[in-house]
Every structure is written in structure tokens, then in C-alpha cells.
């Protein structure tokens, strides 16, 4: 999968054998164009960048408000956790969630 950014592309490798429901969710949203024009709403230099708020983060919508970006998700139900033993090394993509382990929806961080 390729994440197209204004400054270049990011190749993303997904692991359906490790997190099948999360991978399917990302692929579905991407294939439906839901991630198009969605901003990175949380960036911590040298640490992580978070995006994927398809409800409030689409900068091409008339009602876009950066201060609300990061507070929403898709219209699909939240996903149950699929925790695994893969390390969070630099460049790893992971689904974002609240303190509820079963709250991943559309947001992810790298």
C-alpha cells in the first residue's frame, strides 16, 4: 500500500496474518477514498505522526476545522483489539485508540 503525501510517497507494509481486521479496515477506507485529503493532526517531531480522522480531518471539506481533527473516526464500528508481539520500531504503523483497547477505528500513527 502506498500513502501519497505532498512531499513524497510512503510505502506501507500491512500484516493481515497478525491483525486481519485492522488491515481490512485500513484497506477498505483507503480503497473508498476516505483517507484522501485527511491531515496529520498530531505530529511529534522525531517520534510520531498521527492521521486518519476521516470524520473531522478532511481538509477539502467546507466544514474542516483543524482543532476538531483527531476527535473522530469512520462510520464503521470500532474494532476489537488485535494486540501482537511485533515491536514498535521506527516506521511502524499502528492503529490509534483511546484508553479502551477495543476503540480503534480509522486513525493510525507512524
Q: Residue spans of the language-model regions?
A:
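Cyclophilin-like peptidyl-prolyl cis-trans isomerases
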Residues: 1-110
Amino acid at each position: 500500500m502506498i500513502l501519497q503525501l505532498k512531499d513524497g510517497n510512503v510505502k506501507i507494509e500491512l500484516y493481515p496474518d497478525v491483525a486481519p481486521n485492522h488491515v481490512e479496515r485500513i484497506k477498505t477506507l483507503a480503497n473508498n477514498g476516505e483517507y484522501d485529503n485527511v491531515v496529520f493532526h498530531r505530529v511529534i517531531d522525531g517520534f510520531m505522526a498521527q492521521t486518519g480522522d476521516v470524520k473531522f480531518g478532511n481538509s477539502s471539506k467546507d466544514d474542516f476545522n483543524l482543532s476538531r481533527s483527531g476527535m473522530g473516526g469512520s462510520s464503521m464500528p470500532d474494532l476489537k483489539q488485535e494486540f501482537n508481539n511485533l515491536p514498535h520500531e521506527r516506521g511502524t504503523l499502528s492503529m490509534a485508540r483511546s484508553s479502551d483497547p477495543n476503540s480503534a477505528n480509522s486513525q493510525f500513527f507512524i
